[in-house]
Regions:
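Positively charged n-region of N-terminal signal peptides that target proteins for export
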Residues: 1-8
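C-terminal motif of bacterial Sec signal peptides marking the signal peptidase cleavage site
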Residues: 15-17
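Short, low-complexity, disordered segments immediately C-terminal to signal peptides
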Residues: 19-45
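Acidic/aromatic-lined carbohydrate-recognition and catalytic surfaces
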Residues: 20-23, 53-64, 69, 75-286, ...
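Loop/helix patches that line or flank the sugar-binding groove of alpha-linked glycan CAZymes
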Residues: 91, 391, 403, 409-412, ...
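Conserved alpha/beta catalytic core and glycan-binding cleft of carbohydrate-active enzymes
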Residues: 215-216, 221-222, 226-250, 327-328, ...
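Beta-strand-rich binding/interaction modules
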Residues: 634-655
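C-terminal beta-strand-rich structural cap/linker in extracellular carbohydrate-active enzymes
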Residues: 660-679
Length: 679
């Protein structure tokens, strides 16, 4: 389904009866007029079109030209007939301003990473289980390889949750660290995916659970078989079966140990199907070194280290020593490899782990329903406190390692989905929270479906629901097999097209009867041709998106989603998806956002508005000042005296606009803007 997303957006445009001129406007030509006269745009469906030369925020056409200098997103607004008072487009301020941005993120480890649970992402073979080819077919949704195309999320890295063979759906208990689970595909499928990711500038990191294996791993099976055959009272001999020392066995049941048989117990802190590895055994470390080299030599860009506080039970020093060993091993193979670790503990503890050489640690203080991000979005934490927290944590981490790369995230596979955090929210707080994450320094992480506002709470399988490509109603429409399958969408747009045809006919009454008949005949022919083509394309999109939907974990509950599917959100200018897309575009366009340091602007910060600058120490990147209104009411600040007074980018949760009137900056409810140096 390589072209489904492109077809979807193209089809949506066709349904509106619109066609775009293929000419390019001069980049930046309309920016000044757009910013200065934004208040003149009508927010309604019949808004007046911007001046010729302003640009759309989407590439509505399939553009396979990837040659240097190609920029499919710079599509001018079609010229409108002066007599035609019906405008075909509604423009958001985000599209009009952010479309001018050039995504210039450097090739380093400060990225935006998209977490993918392959099992639930996209199915390519119809078995209901996501697979690597399903991900390959849908890379264009994550990153289409065309900067500023305006159709993809533009994520620069993918974190693959475990892909190794495993008896469980989540695959954190592997039976072979150097292969791909057959349900997901083959090593060749992985190589194909990795090659395409790299061609698009996407890094790929693998989830690596070094703490434990499956009880079905050959190492454990060999140890189990040996111990079960060992005569009563005899101690195991390492030369006879070294795999016994790969784990921790005992004839006594200590805390955290589970029975293997009537005589032996083994350590399994997570659950009985995950026996803990003895990471102090040199042979185990040799095995793990071989595993990491296998994947790094294959081209993998790094690893996500699972549960690093559990390497050694109640032994923080042992955990840190092992993290140092992993970092030294990985960076000895590839100095540019990226490591991010899960240390689900308090902030001061995981801050201290930056001394180990691991590049990043997930910033749990900001995540989840009770984290700083959600508390700020709810209004339980002031904007000022949020800004101060950013500066304070950066100072904390840099005091341990000045080269730290923070790993902020809002949600992940072990947490309830974020759309359920705000019971009365119809989108604004969900959007704001996403931006708070994506405007933090470091390598920001987004969990698949978060950009759609997916739901899922109660138990782990619910957090890992199928990617919401298309709703059940849309699936049913795809399976209907007739014209009604396109539903009200086509019906409504057909009526609109007929109404416009009638209006065009009346406008032509002053012409000769022959001309009128010719015009009517052409309108009718064009309408029928466009309608047939549109129906075919929309039905193909619906069917393909329906086919790639996954079943999800068997233990998952049935529950409804709160917001629209990818199918509906991609073409919705004000959707959560397009808000995230704009936030990532801003992050990519101003490298200092991820790589700079936060300094609170106390002259302009208050409980409603967070104002802080981002600058890097060596002045390599253009500095910016970020303003965030965390409240549900408009808020104004005076930027008199600021060197960063040019409006560069905006994030708005609705059609309300960021306004700059002289030195007064007004942010709408939950509005955000980026200010920079005047050119």
């Amino acid at each position: 389904m390589k072209k489904t997303i492109a077809l979807l957006t193209a089809a949506c445009l066709l349904l509106s009866g619109c066609q775009l001129n293929s000419q390019k406007s001069e980049p930046g030509a309309a920016t000044d007029s757009v910013i200065s006269s934004m208040d003149s745009l009508d927010d309604g469906a019949n808004a007046a079109a911007p001046d010729q030369g302003a640009t759309l925020g989407y590439d509505w056409t399939q553009n396979d030209d990837k040659s240097a200098g190609s920029d499919a997103s710079q599509v001018p607004v079609p010229e409108m007939d002066a007599a035609d008072d019906q405008t075909l487009f509604t423009f958001s301020q985000m599209s009009l301003i952010n479309n001018e941005l050039a995504e210039t993120a450097p090739d380093d480890n400060y990225r935006t990473t998209y977490e993918v649970f392959v099992y639930s992402f996209a199915d390519s073979d119809g078995d209901g289980i996501g697979d690597l080819n399903g991900l390959y077919d849908n890379l264009g949704y994550i990153n289409d390889g065309q900067p500023s195309s305006g159709m993809d999320l533009s994520a620069g890295e993918i974190w693959l949750m475990p892909i190794f063979p495993s008896p469980t759906y989540h695959k954190y208990d592997t039976t072979n660290y150097m292969d791909v689970d057959p349900a997901y595909g083959t090593l060749e499928d992985f190589d194909k995916l990795l090659k395409e990711c790299h061609a698009r500038g996407i890094n790929v990191i693998l989830d690596l659970a070094l703490n434990h294996t499956s009880t079905e791993h050959p190492w454990f099976l060999a140890a189990k078989d040996y111990l079960e055959k060992l005569p009563a009272g005899k101690d195991p001999v390492k030369d006879e079966c070294p795999y016994v020392w790969y784990y921790t066995f005992s004839r006594e049941q200590y805390p955290g140990f589970v029975p293997m048989d009537d005589t032996w117990y083994y350590e399994a802190r997570f659950w009985e199907g995950m026996p803990d590895l003895n990471l102090s055994t040199p042979e185990v470390r040799n095995e793990l070194s071989t595993i990491m080299k296998f994947w790094l030599d294959r081209g993998v860009d790094g690893f996500r280290l699972d549960a690093v506080t559990s390497y050694y039970t109640d032994n923080p020093d042992g955990n840190m020593e092992f993290m140092r060993w992993v970092a030294d091993t990985v960076h000895g193979i590839n100095p540019k490899a990226y490591l991010v670790a899960e240390a689900w503990t308090d902030q001061s503890s995981y801050a201290s782990y930056y001394s180990t050489g691991v590049n990043s640690f997930f910033d749990f203080a900001y995540s989840g329903a009770d984290g700083i991000i959600a508390q700020t979005a709810r209004g339980n934490m002031s904007a000022k406190s949020f800004a101060e927290s950013l500066a304070n944590e950066e100072n904390l981490y840099s005091s341990v390692n000045e080269h730290f790369i923070n790993a902020p995230f809002y949600t992940n596979h072990d947490m309830p989905r974020s759309a359920g955090y705000y019971a009365d929210d119809d989108g604004p707080r969900t959007k704001l929270a996403g931006a708070l994450n994506l405007l933090m320094t470091g390598n920001a992480f987004v969990y698949y479906g978060e950009e759609l506002g997916m739901m899922g709470s109660g138990k782990d399988p619910n957090y890992r629901a199928p990617m919401y490509w298309i709703s059940e109603d849309e699936c049913d429409a795809a399976g209907a097999g007739d014209e009604a399958g396109t539903g009200a969408k086509i019906e409504a747009d057909t009526k609109a097209a007929e109404a416009k045809a009638e209006a065009d006919s009346k406008a032509a009454e002053t012409k000769t009867e022959a001309d009128t008949k010719t015009t009517e005949a052409k309108v009718e022919a064009d309408s029928k041709a466009a309608g047939s083509e549109t129906r075919a394309e929309v039905k193909m999109v619906e069917q393909e998106m329906s086919d790639m939907m996954c079943d999800g974990p068997a233990e998952m509950d049935n529950f409804a989603m709160k917001f629209g599917s990818a199918y509906s959100q991609i073409s919705d200018e004000y959707s959560i998806f397009n808000y995230y897309r704009n936030a990532i575009r801003i992050r990519n366009s101003f490298p200092v956002i991820a790589r700079g340091r936060t300094v609170v602007d106390y002259d302009r910060t208050n409980d409603s508005v967070a104002a802080f600058t981002r600058k890097d120490s060596d002045g390599k990147y253009e500095p910016v000042e970020i303003f965030i209104n965390s409240t549900s009411e408009p808020a104004s600040v005076d930027i008199t005296g600021s060197d960063l007074r040019e409006l560069k980018a905006v994030l708005t949760v609705s059609s309300d606009k960021v306004m700059l009137d002289g030195t007064t900056l007004t942010l709408p409810a939950f509005g955000i803007c980026v200010m920079g140096e005047a050119k």
